[in-house]
Amino acid sequence: MSHSANFVNVQSPPSYIQLAQQQQQQQQQQLQQQQQTQNPTSPTSFLAQQQYSGNIPTTASNQQPYQHIPQPYQPNISSILQPLPIRYIYVNQLPLAQQQQQLQQNQLQQQPPNVIYQQQPLIVQQQQQPNTVQQQQQQPPQTIQQQPNMAQPQPQQTQQFTMEQTFQNILNKIKDKFDKFTTNHVGQDNITFNNAQLPIAKECNTILLKLQNNRNIHTSSLPFTLTPEVYKPPEFFTKVDIIQYHLSGLASILVLMKLSQVDPSFAKQINLMTVKSKFMIEMLAKIFQQQLDNRNNNNNNNTMSMSITNSTVLSSQKNNNPIIIYFNQQFENIKQLKDYFETSDISSNGLVFFTQTLFSMLTGRGYFWYIGEEVTKQLKYKIFETIYDNLFRTVMKCTSETKYKYNLGCFCYSYFKIIQSDHQVTSARFVTQKPQIKDDLYKYLLHYLSLSNDQLSRALSDVPISDSTIWLIYAKTCCLLNQEEKAQIWIQYFINEATDRVTAAAMIQLDEDIAHYHSKSWYVDIMKSIEEEKKKRIEEDDRLNKQRKQQQQQQQSNSSSPHIVGGHVQDQYSEIKTNLLLEGLVLKNMNHDASLISSNVLLNLHPLPQSKEVQIAQQRLNERLELYMLKNSKEIPGDGNCQMHALSDQLYGDLSHSQEVRKTIVDWLRKNKDFQLPNGATICQFVNTNNWDDYCNDMSKNGNWGDHLTLLAAAEHFGSKISIISSVESQSNFFIEIIPSKILNDKVLLLSHYAEFHYGSLCPLR
């Protein structure tokens, strides 16, 4: 549903435009009077002598000043950063035709325009020097460094003109860059695009992960967060890369068009650009559909696993392809930007997309459309302030939309870090040396930090999100605001829920926002537990190297595990796939990306092996392990005890406890025959024999395969989550998770399952 761009719940009185014109005439008269009393050889303008405060002027008439919706306290940036007067350039703008008419009138009067867009809030640019005590109280104190020098004033008219030219120059550069990109990667009649390759299955699955987690396809960053590293464009552009760059460039051009006094005829060129984008999206959708049809018709060759055909982006319906859905959403947002340029009407989502594009252009180092080096620091500050205004208004307007709270919380923290860096206010200084920071600067930093903390707290309470980046940002805001109890909870949560606790703890240890808590007893205890894990990891690496040497010398057989007792494994496998739905057994695991399936289905992963599929299955498993940055911890022998070997390695760091693990599991099974699942079934109902004791006796024998029940028993006895990445062909059920009724151990047991007959032990890549 489309909304107007006016996010202020008041009617804008039309007399304000007239008031602005009256003020302009009054200023011209005063300027003439001042020039008569000054030396004619060194005239100074009236605007140059005014002290810009950013507040709404008090008029001498009966007109009511422009009122904003209620906002929390916000220190005025003008006393700190000497902003350029472009605040509120996205709200209540006149239609483009009226803007151009006003610009022509100003040019006829041989005067530079007093405002970029003729809109009500910009009347602050024509305000006179406040004379009343009340007006002086509205002006926040200024820092010593930024006190205006009345003897050498900076003429604001020149600033406005320079700012307009700056945006125009940036637009021209981005347009030239966009044209070159289109020529090199799209080509005439889309020839180059048609010849570009499709992303392979691994790349498509990576894209899908990013889309599911609301990440940028190329930078992998959340909206309104700062990227820690400089982004590097791909060496070879796939069709997906080309479309994303084309859409991002088009959005950047439309944003700059809105910020500059561009000729309306320039908008005609946008139509051709948008048509080209839509054509490429439709072409990609057709190619995906062809790949899907080929797969359904079983026409794929042995290289299928390296093709898009094997990716989860393909579904049974063309319109359900997640990449195409994403690109179509991007295209609709671009259409809104085009309408915004022409009519100033835009929806809440469109406005957020506008500000998100602008934020990326200013902060995305290495981003293809990066303009951060083209704008002055003061202008950048004002743009950031305007982004804040838009996001805040969106939150106030759409109170039920939690995603806007996350956006505002992330932006406020990012802006806090930018101001910190520019003013050399370290986090340690912010927390412990408050008296040494100028009062207005400290209030300004505190405002954005507090607002970030508040918005993220509200959002996490309303709709929790399984994104560790959000958790860490919120934890850091709690640290900087000395909310120690909350900081402790979220730091511990961030570390414990990480796949690799050691790496997560290293991130915490190196973060300056948390450094002042390093001496706290709870923090010391956390890091001690991590040090123990580090030592175990070193020992595991040493044992792994020794074992590899021994295995190379012994040249052990790589034959598969023997058949499980009974002659009906395949029938059992099919039956369990159909019937074993353990509702509620598996809770949503916040330990992995959203794409990792928090499955409520435990499958018996032991059908009869089919040798012709082994090679494809191995390649499929390797791609999945690489995608989630995992590797085999040790080479597990294929002697029928592979599941027990893998569990032994995960629990004790070596394979020497395999028999002990088997005995422990079987003992638990004997004692818990009637263990009830959440759906009311008992585990003894899921064996291939009516005699539970016979099943346990067979499972206790060396060389017999472990199954789904032994995994369940291991999870319950050891109190640990078990995560399994399988080589099964299904792209929706390859990640299986078993969560015990009571978690006693924070360590997650990571297993692989290869070619339907062999288990492996996994560890993170290092």
Curated annotation (Swiss-Prot):
InterPro entries named among the record's database cross-references: OTU_dom, Papain-like_cys_pep_sf, Peptidase_C85-like
Domain OTU: 631-765
GO biological-process terms attached to the record: proteolysis
Keyword annotations: Hydrolase, Protease, Thiol protease
GO MF annotation list: cysteine-type deubiquitinase activity
Active site residues according to the UniProt entry: 639, 642, 758
Compositionally biased residues, Low complexity: 550-561
Chain segments carrying region Disordered: 129-159, 537-566
Broad EC category: hydrolase
EC number: 3.1.2.-
Gene3D superfamilies in UniProt: 3.90.70.80
Pfam families on file: OTU
UniProt xrefs under PANTHER family: OTU DOMAIN CONTAINING PROTEIN, OTU DOMAIN-CONTAINING PROTEIN DDB_G0284757
Protein name, per record: OTU domain-containing protein DDB_G0284757
